[in-house]
């Protein structure tokens, strides 16, 4: 039976780090050692930042983004285009679109996508709030920026049906060849979607 190498406090730190996405037990052990070695430069500021996050992080009451205030920084930005709402499944998707500078509209975070196999139904998403926002007379377009998966497309169709009575245009992200992508590395579904959604050159 192996003996304990460290005290329970350090083992607890390693176990908690191992719960983070992309970190297994070995990576968590390396991360813990790095934090301990850089206690003043990294561990103390990280602990402080985590405490601030615990105390101040809020979920935006309007769009579902994570920020230190509600409504969030995006929802209170007067420079944004109020005619566009971009619907995403998760906050990570919102952040990815923001990093890309892909839109100047507002967002709506569903919280997930419909997934009957995982027990996620319409009642588990913020779809009712989205429908209410779509009836705002300033809103002209709802962009469905959902993953090109079965669950993502099911969710997109469900939302499109619900928005039938709202006076808005419903669009979705184009699917196809990524920038820098080579055709022979793409799957058949991606190539088919790219061909169907081709545009003028």
Curated annotation (Swiss-Prot):
Gene3D superfamilies in UniProt: 3.40.1360.10, 6.10.250.240, RecR Domain 1 (1.10.8.420)
Domain of life, per lineage: Bacteria
Any one Gene Ontology BP term: DNA repair
GO molecular function: DNA binding; zinc ion binding
Residue intervals of the Toprim domain: 83-178
SMART domains the UniProt entry points to: TOPRIM (SM00493)
PROSITE patterns attached to this UniProt entry: RECR (PS01300), TOPRIM (PS50880)
Zinc finger map (C4-type): 60-75
Keyword annotations of the record: DNA damage, DNA recombination, DNA repair, Metal-binding, Zinc, Zinc-finger
Keyword Metal-binding: yes
Protein purpose: May play a role in DNA repair. It seems to be involved in an RecBC-independent recombinational process of DNA repair. It may act with RecF and RecO.
Assigned protein family: Belongs to the RecR family.
Protein name according to UniProt: Recombination protein RecR
